Each structure stands twice: as structure tokens, then as C-alpha cells.
Design a protein with these regions (language model features):
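N-terminal anchoring/stem segment of glycosyltransferases
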Residues: 1-56, 234-240
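A structural signal for well-ordered alpha-helical segments within the folded catalytic domains
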Residues: 18-21, 25, 69, 163-171
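Hydrophobic anchor at the start of a short beta-strand
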Residues: 34, 79, 179-181
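A conserved donor-nucleotide-binding helix/loop in the catalytic core
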Residues: 55-80
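The conserved acidic donor/metal-binding loop of glycosyltransferases
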Residues: 83-87
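Conserved donor-nucleotide/metal-binding helix-loop-beta segment in metal-dependent transferases, i.e.
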Residues: 88-121
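A recurrent flexible, glycine/aromatic-enriched loop bordering the glycosyltransferase active site
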Residues: 111-126, 154-161
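Catalytic core and acceptor-binding pocket of nucleotide-sugar-dependent glycosyltransferases
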Residues: 130-240
Length: 240
């Protein structure tokens, strides 16, 4: 297996959207084409940006959940889904770990990253046709209908529905795996070499924050980019 595309998403919230330029460049630097599903109202003209908005749904809800369905629009490409405020730092981690996995598998990079009722959005990868088999959608119209059917009556940002996407992913993967034994490959953090540069450890002293002796897999960046751009750019330049 080899990753072709990464699916990212954001609405018009600058805390997230500002990451698109640098994060898209990082993904390109490890050989993966970035695709942004933009759910804001003001359309963005860019060949790698897919404008997707539903008036009946909150744009944040769409941004979170459309990532599960967006890969179905690329049936012949192997797609990984990720957060827009996460920067990949290691081609070996993302590509090297799956090079010996067959194209008919669905790969869960971090199966133990959340509680048992969820699967972490970061990261999951499969051919677009596999995503079609799992979620039973294959067009913009069917994706829209699926999202509307998922939309909670009392949705609120940061509320009980905030992890809806990860719970839905768990539900659909469990259902699919029950009928398709040996169709899911789960990686292990230790053997895969997962090593995150995490914003939770942020320090104004770069030497305390960034360990040059570590081989980082990714950078969970502090928000917003406009405030922390010097730090983020420095990490980017050290790795690319």
C-alpha cells in the first residue's frame, strides 16, 4: 500500500483554516497529495480545495464528519484522513509502515489512542473503493444525505457530539469487520515508531520543546497559526 491523498477539512474558522498552506506543503513533501474539504460559505478557488457546504448542518460538524466520506470520491486512490492542525514529519512513519500491506486492507494507525467506543481520526487509510464498501456512499449527493442523517438535533461545538466522527467510525468499522474478517490492519505505536511533538508540551524555550535526537512522526501544532507561526515554521524547516 502507498498513500496517494490525505483528506483534510476546515470551515472558515481561522484557528484551523490558517494551517492549510503549511500543512498541505508538509504532506506534499512526504509524497502525498493534500485535499481540503472546505465547509465555509465563502468558496475557495484552488484545485486542491473541494467546497462542500450544507445549509442545514453546522459547518464545524460537516468539517469533522465529511472526512469519513470524502475518500469515496477517489475510488482508485489510497486516502488517509487527518486533522488540519497536525503536521506530518516522517515519510517513514506514514508510508513506510504500510509498504508491505496489501491494497485491500483498511489501516488503523493508532487503534489504542482513544477509549474503546471510538477510533481516532488520526489516522486511518484505505483505497477509496474500500471507504465506499464501509460507508456505502459514492457521490456528493449520497455523502450529503449521509451527513444529514448523522446530524444530531441539538448539535453544539464542543458539546456531547464533539466526538461524533470518531464514534461513527468505530461503529462502521466494527460492523464491516464482522462481515469481512481479516480486512482491517491495526498498527502499534511502539513498533510503528509513533513519536509526537505535542503542543501540550509547549515551551517558549525551543530547546526544551524540541528534542533534536528524536525522530518525530508528527507535530500537533498550537493554535492559532498566526500566533505561533515562528515556532511552527521553525519545526517545518528543521524537517523539510
Amino acid at each position: 500500500m502507498k498513500l496517494d491523498k490525505v483528506i483534510l477539512s476546515s470551515d472558515d474558522n481561522p484557528d484551523y483554516l490558517e494551517f492549510w498552506p503549511i500543512v498541505s506543503e508538509a504532506w506534499r513533501n512526504i509524497g502525498i497529495e493534500p485535499i481540503l474539504f472546505y465547509t465555509g460559505k465563502n468558496k475557495i478557488k484552488n484545485e486542491n480545495v473541494f467546497n462542500f457546504n450544507l445549509e442545514k448542518c453546522d459547518s464545524a460538524f460537516i468539517a469533522q464528519n465529511v472526512r469519513l466520506l470524502a475518500p469515496t470520491l477517489f475510488p482508485n486512490d489510497t486516502c488517509i484522513i487527518s486533522d488540519i492542525d497536525n503536521m506530518p514529519l516522517s515519510e517513514d512513519y506514514f508510508q513506510g509502515n504500510i509498504v508491505n500491506i496489501t491494497d485491500n486492507q483498511f489501516v488503523i494507525y493508532r487503534p489504542d489512542a482513544t477509549s474503546e467506543d471510538m477510533i481516532s481520526i488520526m489516522w486511518n487509510a484505505a483505497k477509496g473503493s474500500k471507504w465506499i464498501d464501509i460507508f456505502e456512499v459514492d457521490s456528493v449527493e449520497s455523502i450529503s444525505k449521509k451527513l444529514l442523517s448523522w446530524y444530531p438535533e441539538n448539535y453544539s461545538i464542543g458539546g456531547d457530539n464533539w466526538y461524533h466522527d470518531q464514534k461513527i467510525l468505530k461503529e462502521f468499522i466494527t460492523r464491516y469487520e464482522a462481515k469481512n474478517i481479516s480486512s482491517i490492519t491495526r498498527l502499534n505505536d511502539e513498533s510503528a515508531g509513533f513519536c509526537r511533538l505535542n503542543r501540550s508540551n509547549y515551551s517558549i524555550f525551543f530547546k526544551k520543546f524540541y528534542d533534536h535526537n528524536k525522530k518525530y512522526s508528527d507535530f500537533h501544532m498550537p493554535r492559532p497559526y498566526s500566533k505561533y507561526h515562528k515556532l511552527i515554521n521553525k519545526v517545518f524547516n528543521l524537517n523539510f
